[in-house]
Amino acid sequence: QRWWNIIVYLSDDLQPEHGGHLGLWSHDPETNLPKELKVEVEPKFNRAVIFDTTQNSWHGLPIELNTPKGICRQSMAVYYLTEPRIESCLRQRALFAPHENQKDNPEVLDLIKKRADSQNYSSVYRI
């Protein structure tokens, strides 16, 4: 079970206006969806971000990536894995929050749900 995510940003030519920021959302227990954007992290070169990955850890890109040709958002992700705690429910895969213009799109919400399902994620990805 993932316990922590560590993301290290490797691009030294990204500018704030290029987007690609990491967003961390609170969880809405009534809808089981992301509720409020709590933290937004600019992807600066050599910056490391550590965040927990509970069953309700929503993360994604609140500012869509928009880079000129030749510039890309590069990062390295490391996961700290542990045996599941007895008192915790089994963690599914990563929970990605939809963009503001996607949050009412049932197709996008279904894709996020399928992508997070540890048993059926292969129906979404080409493996």
PLM region descriptions:
Residues Q1-R2, S11-I127:
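Catalytic core of Fe(II)/2-oxoglutarate
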